[in-house]
Design a protein with these regions (language model features):
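Soluble accessory domains appended to multi-pass membrane transport proteins
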Residues: 2-108
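Membrane-proximal, solvent-exposed terminal domains/tails of membrane-associated proteins
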Residues: 73-83, 88-167
Length: 167
């Protein structure tokens, strides 16, 4: 009953029979592939059963952001972001945390690099996270995150990591 793939032998489907001499796989085009059992031990194959039982397929994609486009958010930018339904609560909550931190640590706000500030990259990451969490096609019971990876020569990768709701 497991779904296996062995491209080398043309198998991509459900195991329907296992005997001492053969393993029969019903491919998704309804053809039958017969494989000697020793190949399952001596060669590599992919068993998709864990993915089927997990409740969804894992999706892992990156979006590269041009490093030169990242900047601190101005009050005008934050006002625009607050108008976006998926961002309003995040911007309000984060701005409160930033202001409290800067006040508590007596930060001189006249210099932008002092203290904490929101960036357009951080706000975009929050937007992507909230967007994924709003989709019915994303499994909300399993991990769903957007994280920033190490910068590369092509930019700053934002990795989207989640599981689909359909197997």
């Amino acid at each position: 009953g497991d779904w296996i793939t062995m491209p080398k032998y043309g198998a991509d489907g459900t195991v329907i029979e296992v005997t001492l001499n053969t393993v029969k796989v019903r491919n998704f085009d309804n053809t039958i592939t017969t494989i000697p059992p020793y190949l399952l031990v001596s060669d590599s194959f992919q068993n998709w059963q864990g993915m089927q039982e997990s409740g969804g397929r894992r999706v892992k994609r990156s979006i590269n952001i041009d490093m030169s486009s990242v900047r601190f958010c101005t009050p005008e930018m934050l006002a625009k972001y607050r108008k976006i339904q998926l961002l309003k609560d995040y911007v309000d909550r984060t701005e409160k945390v930033v202001e409290e931190y800067n006040k508590e640590h007596n930060i001189d706000n006249s210099v932008l690099v002092n203290g904490r500030r929101q960036t357009n990259l951080g706000v975009f990451r929050a937007y992507l996270t909230n967007y994924l969490k709003s989709l019915p096609t994303v499994n909300q019971e399993l991990t769903c995150m957007v994280r920033q990876l190490q910068p590369t020569e092509t930019g700053i990768p934002l990795e989207l990591y989640f599981f689909s709701a359909n197997k």
